[in-house]
């Protein structure tokens, strides 16, 4: 009887049953193929910033989204790129030749795209991405963020722009933009270009649901223009059409 009982219990611990319990977690479907992440080359003083960078990278991998970033392995840039690369995701680092030395930014993981200038770097990152996310960062992060917001306002692209507002880091910026709306310098539709959330998961969900706001009737309708012929045109990624959008 004891032998029969042991045989009856054996299937529960069989390798086949154990393997069935260890099914791989399915990736969450996403409408984005690649997301561009702007963030600091410093880790920041709060551990929460670093945790958020890693969590964002993990969320991108879980959703099967490639990472596009400015290259390097330092600060938050390094954390998010390592999280994606280490999780089996694809990383595209866009690095300007001779502008940012390797000693300063460190090694770039994954696929390296070499460009000739900082202007080309921003244009290439934007062209390759389906959405933009800004983690906490400094002047460079703000410049990149505000530029893609402006491009959306000018109808160069209709891609969602997200702020990962970790511990309220971007509260002051959002308050400033709200004041600009109140004072008549930013239109209410243009304010809706920016999507913000405190966690990577919440932000990506919001970006997935993003619908571009209606544009002002007087806004210029511009087209994206990428020039690789000469440095003279490297910074010109758009050109105005003669007609106004009405």
From Swiss-Prot:
Keyword Hydrolase attributed: yes
Chain's role: Cytokinin-activating enzyme working in the direct activation pathway. Phosphoribohydrolase that converts inactive cytokinin nucleotides to the biologically active free-base forms.
Family: Belongs to the LOG family.
Gene: LOGL5
GO CC annotation terms, alphabetical: cytosol; nucleus
Sequence segments annotated as region (Disordered): 1-28
Catalyzed reactions: N(6)-(dimethylallyl)adenosine 5'-phosphate + H2O = N(6)-dimethylallyladenine + D-ribose 5-phosphate; 9-ribosyl-trans-zeatin 5'-phosphate + H2O = trans-zeatin + D-ribose 5-phosphate
Any one GO MF annotation of this record: cytokinin riboside 5'-monophosphate phosphoribohydrolase activity
Tissues with expression: Expressed in roots and leaves.
Domain of life from the UniProt record: Eukaryota
Annotated organism of origin: Oryza sativa subsp. japonica
Record-given protein name: Probable cytokinin riboside 5'-monophosphate phosphoribohydrolase LOGL5
Biased composition (Basic and acidic residues): 1-10
Record keywords: Cytokinin biosynthesis, Hydrolase
NCBIfam families, per database record: Rossman fold protein, TIGR00730 family (TIGR00730)
